[in-house]
Protein backbone atom coordinates (compact mmCIF):
# COMPACT_ATOMS: atom_id res chain seq x y z
CA UNK A 1 0.00 0.00 0.00
CA UNK A 2 2.78 2.48 0.80
CA UNK A 3 4.22 2.26 -2.74
CA UNK A 4 0.91 3.38 -4.21
CA UNK A 5 0.64 6.23 -1.70
CA UNK A 6 4.18 7.41 -2.49
CA UNK A 7 3.42 7.38 -6.22
CA UNK A 8 0.36 9.55 -5.55
CA UNK A 9 2.41 12.13 -3.61
CA UNK A 10 1.72 10.93 -0.07
CA UNK A 11 4.35 10.63 2.64
CA UNK A 12 4.91 10.63 6.41
CA UNK A 13 7.09 12.83 8.61
CA UNK A 14 9.54 9.97 9.33
CA UNK A 15 9.97 9.46 5.56
CA UNK A 16 10.58 13.18 4.95
CA UNK A 17 13.09 13.36 7.81
CA UNK A 18 14.91 10.28 6.46
CA UNK A 19 15.04 11.86 2.97
CA UNK A 20 16.47 15.08 4.41
CA UNK A 21 19.15 13.17 6.33
CA UNK A 22 20.03 11.20 3.19
CA UNK A 23 20.22 14.37 1.06
CA UNK A 24 22.43 16.09 3.65
CA UNK A 25 24.62 12.97 3.83
CA UNK A 26 24.55 12.94 7.60
CA UNK A 27 24.33 10.18 10.16
CA UNK A 28 22.43 12.50 12.48
CA UNK A 29 20.23 10.56 14.91
CA UNK A 30 16.94 11.98 16.14
CA UNK A 31 16.81 11.70 19.94
CA UNK A 32 13.54 13.31 21.02
CA UNK A 33 10.33 14.30 19.24
CA UNK A 34 7.45 16.48 20.37
CA UNK A 35 4.19 15.63 18.63
CA UNK A 36 1.45 17.98 19.72
CA UNK A 37 2.07 18.34 23.45
CA UNK A 38 3.76 14.94 23.92
CA UNK A 39 7.55 14.58 24.21
CA UNK A 40 8.87 11.13 23.31
CA UNK A 41 11.85 9.19 22.00
CA UNK A 42 12.33 8.72 18.26
CA UNK A 43 11.45 5.04 18.65
CA UNK A 44 8.14 5.90 20.32
CA UNK A 45 7.44 8.62 17.72
CA UNK A 46 7.74 6.00 14.98
CA UNK A 47 4.64 4.37 16.51
CA UNK A 48 2.68 7.58 17.14
CA UNK A 49 -0.42 7.64 14.89
CA UNK A 50 -0.31 11.38 14.11
CA UNK A 51 3.45 11.42 13.37
CA UNK A 52 3.32 8.36 11.12
CA UNK A 53 0.04 9.24 9.39
CA UNK A 54 0.24 9.36 5.60
CA UNK A 55 -0.52 12.83 4.20
CA UNK A 56 -0.40 14.55 0.84
CA UNK A 57 2.82 16.57 0.64
CA UNK A 58 1.88 18.40 -2.53
CA UNK A 59 0.24 21.77 -2.85
CA UNK A 60 -2.99 22.34 -0.93
CA UNK A 61 -3.53 22.51 2.81
CA UNK A 62 -1.22 21.60 5.67
CA UNK A 63 -2.09 17.96 6.33
CA UNK A 64 0.86 16.73 8.41
CA UNK A 65 0.78 17.09 12.19
CA UNK A 66 2.90 19.66 13.99
CA UNK A 67 6.14 18.35 15.49
CA UNK A 68 9.61 19.32 16.66
CA UNK A 69 12.48 16.82 16.65
CA UNK A 70 15.93 17.15 18.23
CA UNK A 71 19.25 15.50 17.51
CA UNK A 72 22.58 16.35 19.13
CA UNK A 73 23.27 19.01 16.49
CA UNK A 74 19.96 19.97 14.82
CA UNK A 75 16.33 20.86 15.45
CA UNK A 76 13.82 19.62 12.83
CA UNK A 77 10.33 21.01 12.20
CA UNK A 78 7.58 21.10 9.57
CA UNK A 79 7.75 23.69 6.80
CA UNK A 80 4.85 24.63 4.57
CA UNK A 81 4.92 26.86 1.52
CA UNK A 82 1.76 27.28 -0.54
CA UNK A 83 0.50 23.99 0.84
CA UNK A 84 3.63 21.98 -0.01
CA UNK A 85 5.01 20.34 3.13
CA UNK A 86 8.64 19.55 3.87
CA UNK A 87 11.06 19.36 6.80
CA UNK A 88 13.36 22.20 7.81
CA UNK A 89 16.24 22.17 10.25
CA UNK A 90 18.36 24.66 12.14
CA UNK A 91 21.42 24.17 14.36
CA UNK A 92 20.53 23.18 17.91
CA UNK A 93 23.21 25.38 19.46
CA UNK A 94 24.60 28.81 18.59
CA UNK A 95 27.16 28.55 15.79
CA UNK A 96 28.40 30.32 12.68
CA UNK A 97 25.77 28.72 10.41
CA UNK A 98 23.23 31.14 8.95
CA UNK A 99 19.71 29.92 8.23
CA UNK A 100 18.34 30.17 4.70
CA UNK A 101 14.83 31.52 4.14
CA UNK A 102 12.16 28.86 4.53
CA UNK A 103 9.33 28.83 2.06
CA UNK A 104 9.34 30.35 -1.41
CA UNK A 105 11.71 32.70 -3.07
How would you name each of these model-derived features?
Residues 1-55:
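N-terminal domain-onset segments
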Residues 44-83:
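Amphipathic, interaction-prone secondary-structure segments
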Residues 30, 40, 78-80, 85-86:
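Generic marker of "main functional regions" within proteins
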Residues 88-105:
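Compact, glycine/acidic-enriched structural inserts
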